[in-house]
A protein has these predicted regions:
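Conserved radical SAM core fold
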Residues: 52-55, 92-96
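A short, structured active-site edge motif that brings together acidic residues
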Residues: 83-95
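N-terminal binding-site loop/beta-alpha segment at the start of enzyme catalytic domains
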Residues: 1-86
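Glycine/proline-rich, positively charged
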Residues: 27, 94-101
């Protein structure tokens, strides 16, 4: 695996990121865990997720979002992997229908 410097931090991230957009929507948790395990075995330490990943195809706040982030979080917690992975995320979806989050 090739790595790149992350800014001036001294940290090195894999040039390939493992995307998690389908985790929870198309890819069930056991398969997602296997994909992340395989990614780490291949040297990938840069994972990409977002608060809308793993949610319904059409934005509907009542159906929930962030399922991908939850799956990645459970995978990290299982075996103390947090120190092994750089996690990129972004936010988009409002946190409530009232706007008072």
């Amino acid at each position: 695996m090739q790595y790149a410097h992350l800014g001036r931090s001294g940290a090195q991230v894999s040039r390939l990121a493992l995307g998690t957009m389908n985790f929870g929507m198309v890819t069930e948790e056991p398969e997602a865990f296997a994909i992340m395990d395989a990614g780490r075995e291949a040297g990938i330490n840069f994972f990409d997720t977002a608060d809308v990943y793993g949610g319904p195809m059409k934005p509907d706040i009542e159906k929930g979002f962030g399922i991908s982030e939850e799956i990645v979080g459970r995978w990290m917690a299982r075996g103390g992997r947090r120190d092994e992975v750089f996690l990129a995320t972004k936010l988009y979806q409002p946190t409530s229908t009232s706007g008072n989050a």
